């Protein structure tokens, strides 16, 4: 089963933000981050799993120093994102195999609906810690399991397969050397996007997400959406 963001009908409905909440969630993450590590507009941000670059363009329009990273070159990167010295602010790399950056160079890493689809989340979190400056932040939004503890098992290839409970997301971050400073439920954003998919006739996309009810584990899992801030500990 393919990941949800690869489906044309999902991209058509979600636009340039392949996740719940769009820029509202992005802005919320940055606002929360300022409580623990305010590097100002000059702070360096990397958007891992940036997709078509919607968050990169949004934050650069605010004057932020932000770059995007994804596993493939996206044609949308050239649209609406001014190049600096002829170079677009994007990198192509496998985030789990190694980020193409020196140690301690970033103030924040954005992971918006990314951790749950990574093949090796622990390896990525170790890399994230390496490239963040002391006190730097990992700002995440992702699917999480609001019901029983543990990873969703009925949907082994959909986006919801990697969703974890709050306790499990926290434990993963702590094992990699982060302290989770804030965690909040943002499930209404997930509900709005799910409703849009149904309204526009993309019900199959709900199955990709693991939100199709008891047949794929949706009812038992109570999948929700959350955002959290984790800080690099020394």
Show which residues each predicted segment covers.
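A short SAM/SAH-binding and catalytic strip from SAM-dependent methyltransferases
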Residues: 108-119
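Short, glycine-/aromatic-enriched active-site segment of Class I SAM-dependent methyltransferases
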Residues: 143-160
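A short acidic, Gly/Pro-enriched loop at the edge of an enzyme's catalytic core
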Residues: 97-108
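Conserved Class I S-adenosyl-L-methionine
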Residues: 184-234
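Short alpha-helix
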Residues: 162-176
